[in-house]
Amino acid sequence: MVNFTVDEIRGLMDKKRNIRNMSVIAHVDHGKSTLTDSLVSKAGIIAGAKAGETRFTDTRKDEQERCITIKSTAISMYFEVEEKDLVFITHPDQREKECKGFLINLIDSPGHVDFSSEVTAALRVTDGALVVVDCVSGVCVQTETVLRQAIAERIKPILFMNKMDRALLELQLDAEELYQTFQRIVENVNVIIATYNDDGGPMGEVRVDPSKGSVGFGSGLHGWAFTLKQFSEMYSEKFKIDVVKLMNRLWGENFFNAKTKKWQKQKEADNKRSFCMYILDPIYKVFDAIMNYKKEEIGTLLEKIGVTLKHEDKDKDGKALLKTVMRTWLPAGEALLQMIAIHLPSPVVAQKYRMEMLYEGPHDDEAAIAVKSCDPDGPLMMYISKMVPTSDKGRFYAFGRVFAGKVATGQKCRIMGPNYTPGKKEDLYEKAIQRTILMMGRYVEAIEDVPSGNICGLVGVDQFLVKTGTITTFKDAHNMKVMKFSVSPVVRVAVEPKNPADLPKLVEGLKRLAKSDPMVQCIIEESGEHIIAGAGELHLEICLKDLEEDHACIPLKKSDPVVSYRETVSEESDQMCLSKSPNKHNRLLMKALPMPDGLPEDIDNGDVSAKDEFKARARYLSEKYDYDVTEARKIWCFGPDGTGPNFILDCTKSVQYLNEIKDSVVAGFQWASKEGILADENLRGVRFNIYDVTLHADAIHRGGGQIIPTTRRCLYAAAITAKPRLMEPVYLCEIQCPEVAVGGIYGVLNRRRGHVFEENQVVGTPMFVVKAYLPVNESFGFTADLRSNTGGQAFPQCVFDHWQVLPGDPSEPSSKPYAIVQDTRKRKGLKEGLPDLSQYLDKL
């Protein structure tokens, strides 16, 4: 059944120029898993007839039931590429001489936006991405999100237009319309690529181009696909033209005039577009003959395209026959394989330009150089991007990629978590690796050792890492950079066991859940509640199901989903706030003000951060936000956690001993910005100015115990006097629906405080795309509500987009924010009612 053995794969692992690490990414339901099947069947892992229905990479039971991919799954496959195709691989680092075998490590990733953290984990360990787009619905919001992530990680995309069978059979598009649809999708994808890619960057040309062969067309369900290369090979003998020249002619504004036998650039009466005439017409003829049961035509057509049917296939007709014919004529596995081998980079090529994005340390130390040259004899550098649960309850494989060196069974190495800093001991373990394994979709195979440029799993590392980390043998190595997720966990649920005696099991289960999902957060509140935070309703539902059935194995009680809020201020403090230390010898004077719009987002994106050179940062702030340069240079720190979207500014004039209390003030600020004044939520977009400090001359009277609580009280007083407000998270919703259902969408959104900001028709189809902002708080049950109001015709996708201020004053008992604040305070076990200013403000 399988065309290769583990030994063959191990042999290929050393030929690093013939390795391709790639992931399949796309919008939800555009056919990633189905398409992956045709590659898997080409490798001989599943039977060809089953391809397109098996969805081999959907390994979990709930994935099969819901027909969605939830976890990304890896699989390694061995292929041989024919001599005539090897000619197209021109770069010397893209293939080994005298070797036809290619090793393709493929990761099938989920398309649903709630699981986009899985996509991030998959992208980190791969070098190329196959972007699948449904040619009927075009480029959607999730396509754009994952493509943007891929380009930020410096991953080279190739494009595949899926579901061509729908365009022909359901929509009945004619050839010219179909060409225009393709043309539009290619343009859209290239616009996204150009927006996020720096031109003249180290990756070279990343835009996709059908005439170069980096765009495929076909149908994953029916198992057929082609690139222009396949067709131009068929025609090159007939026309006696070079294959590459012909590929350029088969796309774009090229027309062939049958009467004069000449190529032309303009459309005239007698000529047809070459793509339609030479590629789409034969396909249309085959579809037409078979679907309309024209027996005589079928025979002559099959002879022309060179397809001979097997004996058992001769009795088929209709769709079954169509599938068989198209599959024999244009096998999908072959077309995809050629695209992957020719256009995606090998680890040798990719690590040259990805090293600086991946490695935190200096770019000239031993580890960095080994990663850059993908050197199997250098020190081991491996990044673990996620944990995969094993059949053995509670144990995990660590799944990741070897960037340099070799990882072997029984090898001793340093396991570094994300908080490790070189030279310190925290988050660092020195342990031996129990086993190295090869991931094969639903199965794993044991393997002795794995050299650089490959993807593998490790056994026995899971006790030392939570989710991600770096494994190395080089003692001065820095960490690989932490992954940036495009969504953030904003929806929370409190869980407790139905039987209180099961509490230890729940805690154990939460630990395992935190391991198995790259993004979920498990928090224990001060009131003793266990909170799970996820990206959205679906993500939480899957997490809770996993927790109940696999990780904790006990019945649970779940609260209703709750949304995380942020606190902010709406204007400058109306008075100077003074606080005295407990021993009355030190005084602080401060005010709070809101940041200008856009600055908190800049801090979140890392455009302004604590690591920046302070003069450059001050220049940026003064140019973009009109900050005073001298003040902007004196940002003491960001918070919460040293990176959050609030900061404290030193506006004092010549104060004695100021630097000695800086650490204490910063500590107080981190505390205050993590637990805001209204409901103990994080602060966002607040700038605190320190105006004056009076300190005791004796160092012993101005220690941390005096300054930290004083700072916190002063910050709270400043926040209360600056009109505090609540901020809520907002989803960007993209809804696809037919024209008749658009009215129903507006109704549902208006009831839920949402508003539509863009609506357009997908050209060439009756579908509309509506984009709207919807507060997360109102999004529970939104999908069900929407479907019942539109007769099940609308499909929403919600992505966390931004934070916005909740209208209303939290101090007025009749307002909505007041109710939310009281609910939150009650849930967290805080005193009812808002805190009084007099607790925090002191008199001179």
Curated annotation (Swiss-Prot):
A GO cellular component annotation in the UniProt record: cytosol
Modified residues (Diphthamide): 701
EC number(s) on file: 3.6.5.-
GO biological process, one term: translational elongation
Main localisation: cytoplasm
Top EC class of this enzyme: hydrolase
Keyword presence, Phosphoprotein: yes
Catalytic activity from the UniProt record: GTP + H2O = GDP + phosphate + H(+)
Keywords, alphabetical: Cytoplasm, Elongation factor, GTP-binding, Hydrolase, Nucleotide-binding, Phosphoprotein, Protein biosynthesis
Places the protein is found: Cytoplasm
Stretches assigned to the tr-type G domain: 17-348
Phosphothreonine: modified positions: 57, 59
CDD domains reported in the protein's UniProt record: aeEF2_snRNP_like_IV, eEF2_snRNP_like_C, EF2, EF2_snRNP_III, EF2_snRNP_like_II
GO molecular function, one term: GTPase activity
Keyword GTP-binding part of the UniProt annotation: yes
Record-listed GTP binding positions: 26-33, 162-165, 219-221
Record PTM: Phosphorylation by EF-2 kinase completely inactivates eEF2.
InterPro entries, alphabetized: EFG_II, EFG_III/V, EFG_V-like, EFTu-like_2, G_TR_CS, P-loop_NTPase, Ribosomal_Su5_D2-typ_SF, Ribsml_uS5_D2-typ_fold_subgr
Protein family: Belongs to the TRAFAC class translation factor GTPase superfamily. Classic translation factor GTPase family. EF-G/EF-2 subfamily.
PANTHER family per UniProt: EUKARYOTIC TRANSLATION ELONGATION FACTOR 2, TRANSLATION ELONGATION FACTOR-RELATED
Function: Catalyzes the GTP-dependent ribosomal translocation step during translation elongation. During this step, the ribosome changes from the pre-translocational (PRE) to the post-translocational (POST) state as the newly formed A-site-bound peptidyl-tRNA and P-site-bound deacylated tRNA move to the P and E sites, respectively. Catalyzes the coordinated movement of the two tRNA molecules, the mRNA and conformational changes in the ribosome.
Protein name (Swiss-Prot/TrEMBL): Eukaryotic translation elongation factor 2
Annotated source species: Drosophila melanogaster
Gene: eEF2
